[in-house]
């Protein structure tokens, strides 16, 4: 998108809650090719904006920056805060000077308190797993707990433990301890998008048929689906479908208020 198009959409959705804005911006990236650069194209090029490709980290960064900024320029300034453990610095040529100080681990993002408030414990019984990189233990919602939700009569999308998910919530997917390569706890990140769909059903009332409208809330995950050596793209999928087939052992969740 051009700066003009970005500014127009920022203005269009400015009155919506921040979570909705995050989800709407994430949705704008659906179909974007997966970033094949091992470091991330934005890191290699030392730029803030590299919207031609996206991995899960860049999608997370950009959706929040664009949602919180009122202009494209303000989004860049927000990026200097959100992407970095301390704060990003730009040179006179607009290039990033200190990408080595960026968030490289999803667990560092959620534990920084700058990537929303952690709400993991609101979705069911938490399980403790072995941590790494200075964390003795980490509390997660296990995949087993999530699948138990999906086996309920209303399914994962409508189950009580996930009915609290809101637009723009961040889901951090947790790797099995034995699959960690460089001490990483989080293996993937996605953004929640909810939609309400109306369904009509026929009911009988006083021997007369009438149409009754029922709203069904669907929960989607927007995420950069791919591998650095195989490609892919940003997808929007049912959260229940992703949970059923995901290679991760659980999740943590954060929310911007």
Positions of predicted regions on the chain:
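N-terminal capping segments
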Residues: 1-139, 164, 181-183
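Generic preference for well-ordered secondary structure
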Residues: 6, 10, 44, 155, ...
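Generic detector of short, locally flexible boundary/turn motifs and exposed helical patches
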Residues: 25-26, 60, 155-158, 166-167, ...
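Bimodal feature
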Residues: 48-55, 77, 207, 215, ...
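Detector for Asparagine
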Residues: 77, 86, 92-93, 98, ...
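A mid-sequence, solvent-exposed acidic-amphipathic segment
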Residues: 127-179
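Short, basic, low-complexity termini and linkers enriched in Ser/Thr/Gly/Pro
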Residues: 153-156, 194-218, 257
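Low-complexity, Gly/Ser/Thr/Pro-rich intrinsically disordered linker/tail segments
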Residues: 162, 167-176, 184-187, 191-194, ...
């Amino acid at each position: 998108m051009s700066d003009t198009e970005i500014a127009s959409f920022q203005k269009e959705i400015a009155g919506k809650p921040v979570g909705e804005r995050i989800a709407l911006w994430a949705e704008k990236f659906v179909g974007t090719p997966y970033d094949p650069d091992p470091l991330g194209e934005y890191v290699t090029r030392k730029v803030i904006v590299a919207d031609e490709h996206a991995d899960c980290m860049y999608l997370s960064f950009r959706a929040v920056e664009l949602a919180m900024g009122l202009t494209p320029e303000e989004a860049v300034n927000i990026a200097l805060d959100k992407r970095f453990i301390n704060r990003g610095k730009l040179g006179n040529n607009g290039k990033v000077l200190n990408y080595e100080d960026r968030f490289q681990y999803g667990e560092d993002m959620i534990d920084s308190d700058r990537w929303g408030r952690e709400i993991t414990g609101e979705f069911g019984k938490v399980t403790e797993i072995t941590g790494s990189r200075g964390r003795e233990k980490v509390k997660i919602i296990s995949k087993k707990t999530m699948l138990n939700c999906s086996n309920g009569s209303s399914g994962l999308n409508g189950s009580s433990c996930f009915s609290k998910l809101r637009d723009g919530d961040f889901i951090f997917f947790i790797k099995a301890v034995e699959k960690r390569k460089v001490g990483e706890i989080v293996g993937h990140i996605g953004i929640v998008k909810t939609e309400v769909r109306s369904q009509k059903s026929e009911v009988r009332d006083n021997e007369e048929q009438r149409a009754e409208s029922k709203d069904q809330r669907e929960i989607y995950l927007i995420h950069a689906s791919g591998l650095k050596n195989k490609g892919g793209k940003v997808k929007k999928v049912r959260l229940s479908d992703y949970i059923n087939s995901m290679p991760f052992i659980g999740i943590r969740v954060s929310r911007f208020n």
